[in-house]
A protein has these predicted regions:
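Local cysteine-cluster metal-coordination motifs and their immediate loop/turn environment
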Residues: 1-17, 31-45
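Short cysteine/histidine-rich zinc-coordinating motifs and their immediately flanking basic loops
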Residues: 16-21, 48-52
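Short active-site oxyanion
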Residues: 2-4, 167-170, 278-281
């Protein structure tokens, strides 16, 4: 019933302690394990079947193993269930350094100054990077399949922050302890700016403008109204004529929940320069 397998070991350990008496409160018993992939139903079914014991079913004979239609057991299935399968960040890389990011405590602010002297003095610190070290090139953190689907609206380390947690400095050190200690010593002085937290308010006249200066060339439709993309007449035909010819029209404002297709496993990649100077990821 699992898909990515990241939550499987925790689910399996918890499920191993359950009895038939726990089934009426199964969701509460399993609340300490989160799963992004399954919607939990197949996990409930599997646990219930395991707790209740084998059930004799009537029906057609099972398909012979190895034939067409037979279940295929993934090569890593047993290792994943047992928590033995290494994930990307479980693999040690010889000579690797540790990076920690300092995030903004403000939703919208301009950085006045950053004092990194104390952080650089921590033993084991290799570098402390800020917007003064970052290229001026802008990009998007949207990360869709094609880069041009998203606006060029921020630098990798920007001198203006637009959400709580946006990175303002990066500490690189030989150990995690040194990186953590140095990150706590980075002192940032902010000029706090007005912030906006509602999409309708963001489009109203007088709302704080988050990306002034961005243009359609940056793939920002209307920076003065905080609008990154919009559809106009001409997309899909003559909208006014079609509505006029319709037997029934319905108007209103509809809202839907946000969907994030995000796995539980930390986003991670391992990269290095090979002997030919090529970046391998």
């Amino acid at each position: 019933g699992f898909q990515c397998g990241f939550c499987t070991p925790g689910m399996a350990v918890t499920a191993s302690t359950l009895t038939e008496a726990d089934l009426p409160e199964l969701d509460r018993r399993m609340k300490g394990s989160l799963c992004r992939c399954t919607g939990y139903r197949p996990i409930r079914e599997a646990i219930t079947a395991a707790v209740m014991g084998p059930v004799r079913e009537t029906g057609p004979a099972p398909v012979a193993s190895g034939g067409i239609g037979a279940s295929v057991i993934p090569e890593a299935a047993r290792r994943v269930v047992q928590g033995l399968e290494p994930y990307t960040l479980d693999e040690p890389v010889t000579g690797s350094l540790v990076l920690r990011v300092v995030g903004s405590p403000h939703a919208h602010a301009r950085i006045i100054s950053i004092d990194t002297d104390a952080a650089r003095a921590v033993p084991g610190v290799v570098a402390v990077l800020t917007h003064e070290d970052a290229p001026a090139t802008r990009f998007s953190t949207g990360r869709h399949e094609h880069r041009t689907d998203d606006p060029d609206d921020t630098r990798v380390l920007d001198d203006t922050v637009r959400f709580i947690g946006q990175r303002v400095a990066a500490v690189v050190a030989e150990t995690a302890a040194a990186a953590d200690a140095a990150a706590r010593l980075v002192q940032v002085e902010y000029d706090i700016l007005p912030a906006v937290f509602d999409p309708e308010e963001a489009r109203t006249p007088g709302a704080p403008v988050l990306h002034p200066g961005r243009t359609p060339e940056d793939r920002v439709a209307d920076a003065s109204r905080n609008v990154v993309a919009q559809l106009h007449d001409g997309h899909g035909g003559d909208i006014d004529a079609t509505l006029s010819a319709s037997a029934v029209t319905v108007s209103g404002t509809w809202q839907t929940s946000r969907v994030t297709h995000a796995q539980l496993e930390t986003h991670g990649a391992v990269g290095w320069l090979d002997e030919d100077g090529r970046l391998v990821i």
